[in-house]
Curated annotation (Swiss-Prot):
Keyword set, alphabetical order: Glycosyltransferase, Metal-binding, Queuosine biosynthesis, Transferase, tRNA processing, Zinc
Gene that encodes it: tgt
Record's catalysed reaction(s): 7-aminomethyl-7-carbaguanine + guanosine(34) in tRNA = 7-aminomethyl-7-carbaguanosine(34) in tRNA + guanine
Active site positions: 90 (proton acceptor), 267 (nucleophile)
Upper classification of the organism: Bacteria, Pseudomonadati, Spirochaetota, Spirochaetia, Spirochaetales
Family the UniProt entry places it in: Belongs to the queuine tRNA-ribosyltransferase family.
Subunit description: Homodimer. Within each dimer, one monomer is responsible for RNA recognition and catalysis, while the other monomer binds to the replacement base PreQ1.
Protein name: Queuine tRNA-ribosyltransferase
Source species of the chain: Borrelia turicatae (strain 91E135)
Chain's role: Catalyzes the base-exchange of a guanine (G) residue with the queuine precursor 7-aminomethyl-7-deazaguanine (PreQ1) at position 34 (anticodon wobble position) in tRNAs with GU(N) anticodons (tRNA-Asp, -Asn, -His and -Tyr). Catalysis occurs through a double-displacement mechanism. The nucleophile active site attacks the C1' of nucleotide 34 to detach the guanine base from the RNA, forming a covalent enzyme-RNA intermediate. The proton acceptor active site deprotonates the incoming PreQ1, allowing a nucleophilic attack on the C1' of the ribose to form the product.
Disulfide bonds: none
Length: 375
C-alpha cells in the first residue's frame, strides 16, 4: 500500500510510493483540486500530460450537484468524469463547517443548509462514507470537524472528541464496505492549536489503524510560526510507516515545510485560483501579470519552464488575455501554475534522492521569498 523508498538524513522528508486502485502515486505528491470532478480551465488530457496521478474531488459539492444518484448511475466517479487516474474525495466537512450560520453540529452528525438553494441536509459519518463508496474513491476521507483558529479550549476539546467518535464510526463503515472495493481510508487528527488535544486525538486515531492519516485543522488562518509548530508536533506523533496528508496547503513555502516534516500528500486550490486573477508562480516569487510593466514584455513568464504558456507565448500577450478576460488566458495561467507545482515537487524529490533536500529548501525559499515579483 505505502512503501518508503528513501529517508532524508537531515530532515523527516522521505520518498515513497502509494499503491492505489487506479495506479501508483509517487510521494511527496501535490494534488490538484477538481472540486466537481474537473479542474477549472484545465482538460483531463492536459492534467495527464502534466503527470497528474491523483486529483481531489469534494463530496459535499458532488452531493449537491449533480447528486449521488447521477454518479451511482455511471457506476463510479471515474466513469462519470472519464478520469482513469486516482481520486481522493474530501468528506465535505470543511465546506459544511465553514457555513457557520447555516449548520448545526450534533454528536450524530451535522445539519446544514445548501449554499445553492437553501435546502436542508444531514451528513453523518456513515452517509459520507457511503457516498464515497459509491464514487469508488481511491482515497476516502472521514467526516471531521475543522475548527477555526482562535476558538477556546473547551470548544476545541468538544470538536476533537466528536471527530474521534466519527472516525470510529467511519472505520466501522469502511470495514463493512462492499465486496471488491479497495479504496484506502484516511482518518483525520484534530485538536486545533492545543498540543494536548493534538496528542489525544492522534493517539485515538492511531488505535484505529486506518491505512492513512491526515492532519486536519491547520493552515486555517493562523500565523506561519503557529502552523509550523503544530505541523512539526502532530507529524512527529504519527509513525513513519503511515502515509501522511495535510489538507489545504498549496503555496511553495508551506509545501516545502510540510515535506521537511515528513508529509507525503497535500492539496490546495491556490495555484489555479490565483491564476484566474493573473498571478503566476515562478522561482522568483509571484509574477502579477496585470501590472503595466509587463505590457510590452516579450519574455516568457519563466524561461526554463516547459509548459504551453512559457514555450509559446509572451508575458505581454498573457497580460492582454487576462486583462481582456479571455478564457485562453485563464487556461494558460492555470496550466502554468499546476505545472510549476509538479515541477517543484519533482525538484524536491530529486533533492531527497540526492541527500540535499535541506540545502535545496533553504536556497529555494531564500530566492522565492526575496523574489523580484513579490509585493
Amino acid at each position: 500500500m505505502f512503501s518508503i523508498i528513501k529517508n532524508d538524513k537531515n530532515s523527516n522528508a522521505r520518498l515513497g510510493v502509494l499503491e492505489l486502485p487506479h495506479g501508483k502515486v509517487e510521494t511527496p505528491c501535490f494534488m490538484p483540486v477538481g472540486t466537481l470532478g474537473a479542474m477549472k480551465a484545465l482538460k483531463h488530457d492536459v492534467l495527464e500530460k502534466l503527470g497528474c496521478d491523483l486529483m481531489l474531488a469534494n463530496t459535499y459539492h458532488l452531493y449537491l450537484r449533480p447528486g449521488i444518484d447521477v454518479i451511482k448511475k455511471y457506476g463510479s466517479l471515474h466513469n462519470f468524469t472519464a478520469w482513469d487516474k486516482n481520486f481522493l474525495t474530501d468528506s465535505g466537512g470543511f465546506q459544511v463547517f465553514s457555513l457557520a450560520n447555516f449548520r448545526k453540529i450534533e454528536t450524530e452528525g451535522v445539519d446544514f443548509k445548501s449554499h445553492i438553494d437553501g435546502s436542508r441536509h444531514y451528513f453523518t459519518p456513515e452517509s459520507v462514507f457511503k457516498m464515497q463508496e459509491i464514487f469508488e474513491s481511491d482515497i476516502i476521507m472521514a467526516l471531521d470537524i475543522c475548527s477555526s483558529y482562535g476558538i477556546d479550549y473547551s470548544e476545541a476539546s468538544l470538536y476533537t472528541n466528536i471527530t474521534t467518535s466519527w472516525a470510529r464510526r467511519t472505520l466501522r463503515a469502511y470495514e463493512n464496505r462492499k465486496e471488491g472495493y479497495d479504496g484506502l481510508l484516511f482518518l483525520i487528527t484534530q485538536g486545533n492549536f492545543f498540543k494536548d488535544l493534538r496528542k489525544r486525538s492522534t493517539e485515538a486515531i492511531l488505535e484505529l489503524d486506518s491505512p492513512g492519516i491526515a492532519i486536519g485543522g491547520i493552515s486555517v488562518g493562523e500565523p506561519r510560526d503557529k502552523y509550523l509548530e503544530i505541523l512539526e508536533y502532530n507529524s512527529s506523533l504519527i509513525p513513519k510507516v503511515k502515509p501522511k496528508y495535510v489538507m489545504g496547503i498549496g503555496t511553495p513555502h508551506y509545501i516545502l515545510d510540510a515535506i521537511y516534516y515528513g508529509i507525503d500528500i497535500f492539496d490546495c486550490v491556490n495555484p489555479t485560483r490565483i491564476a484566474r486573477h493573473g498571478s503566476l508562480l515562478t522561482d522568483n516569487g509571484i509574477l502579477r501579470i496585470k501590472r503595466a510593466e509587463f505590457n510590452f514584455d516579450t519574455c516568457p513568464v519563466e524561461r526554463d519552464c516547459s509548459c504551453t504558456l512559457c514555450t509559446r507565448y509572451s508575458r505581454g500577450y498573457l497580460r492582454h488575455l487576462i486583462k481582456s478576460e479571455e478564457t485562453l488566458g485563464v487556461m494558460l495561467a492555470s496550466e502554468h501554475n499546476i505545472h510549476y507545482m509538479f515541477r517543484l515537487i519533482k525538484k524536491a524529490r530529486n533533492a531527497i534522492m540526492n541527500g540535499d533536500f535541506t540545502k535545496f529548501r533553504k536556497l529555494y525559499l531564500s530566492k522565492y521569498d526575496e523574489g523580484n515579483f513579490d509585493e
